[in-house]
């Protein structure tokens, strides 16, 4: 039995979880998320808890059991508290500013880079070199932050670029002078 999958998921007050076949819908104060679970796995709501079960001990069922339980738990956390991912912009002249429904970056290119917020995602900017990606879908928040970081990854010599808040960038020594 999966150690993660067998744990029941507590449903907090103000959150409604409904299971319709293979579709799980989670509604809460911050919004609504839906999830389609893989075929052999079953989910059911009992006594304010969500129980995830699997029919057999085949390899595929075992691997999907804990995954499904974690995805449902992430959706419950998302609609109650939400998810955030902080980004820092490091470098001389590198900056970020809110513009329309997205953010505009100056990252040393010959042109500014504009990133529009996907549906369900919002950006907050603190100063000119810190920003936060906010949303209820953990996967979408992480993917959006990764796409922004990908525009200008931190380089190893000076550390310039977009990095996650608190990320350690491995630094290299430069060329040794004569």
Curated annotation (Swiss-Prot):
One of its GO terms (molecular function) is rRNA binding. Gene3D superfamilies: Ribosomal protein L6, alpha-beta domain. GO terms for biological process: cytoplasmic translation. Coiled coil: none annotated. Pfam families: Ribosomal_L6 (PF00347). Keywords: Ribonucleoprotein, Ribosomal protein, RNA-binding, rRNA-binding. One of its GO terms (cellular component) is cytosolic large ribosomal subunit. Signal peptide: none annotated. It comes from the Bacteria. Belongs to the universal ribosomal protein uL6 family. Part of the 50S ribosomal subunit. This protein binds to the 23S rRNA, and is important in its secondary structure. It is located near the subunit interface in the base of the L7/L12 stalk, and near the tRNA binding site of the peptidyltransferase center. PANTHER family: 60S/50S RIBOSOMAL PROTEIN L6/L9, LARGE RIBOSOMAL SUBUNIT PROTEIN UL6M. This is Large ribosomal subunit protein uL6. It comes from Clavibacter sepedonicus (Clavibacter michiganensis subsp. sepedonicus).
